Amino acid sequence: MNALPLLQLFALDCPDPLALADFYARVTGLEVEALGDFPPEEVTWIELLNGDHPTLAFQKVDHYVAPTWPEGPLPQQAHLDFWVDDLDQGEVHVLGVGATKTDFQPGDTFRVFLDPVGHPFCLVLHAAAPEGGLASG
């Protein structure tokens, strides 16, 4: 079992997830996940897939304000999700290297932390980790 996190996907906040997913699908050649019968106007989260695996996600944020880059009053913002074989081991690891666990934990299969400068990231339980851990898969 590997206690080190493995990057699951990268999520970007945005005002229109479908539009931004379409843009990045065209940039990368990756596929936007199928909506099925889900109404496009209600999409608040959508992922780009590399085969069966998500790689990028786009999350709707009401009143989204674009960052000013490379300098300006609103720095660039994003969050990362990392797969782990075991949430407890992953937590010990990230706390040991300087992360802070947030008081609010909204789910059972993931945990939210802050990096040393306050950006949120999640450790997500990888339910189907390959035998021998994620590093072997």
What are these regions (language model features)?
Residues 1-2, 70:
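A detector for short, charged/polar N-terminal pre-domain segments
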Residues 2-5, 11-56, 89-92, 96, ...:
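Core segments of cupin and vicinal oxygen chelate
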Residues 13, 83, 107:
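Charged, low-complexity surface patches
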Residues 31-74, 116, 120-127:
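Conserved short beta-strand elements that form part of the metal-binding/catalytic scaffold
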Residues 68-70, 101-102, 133-134:
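A short, polar/proline- and glycine-enriched secondary-structure boundary/capping micro-motif
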Residues 71-94:
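Mid-chain, well-packed structural core segment of small domains
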Residues 77, 99-119:
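A short, hydrophobic/aromatic-rich structural module that often spans a beta strand
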Residues 128-137:
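A short, polar/charged loop-to-alpha-helix boundary motif
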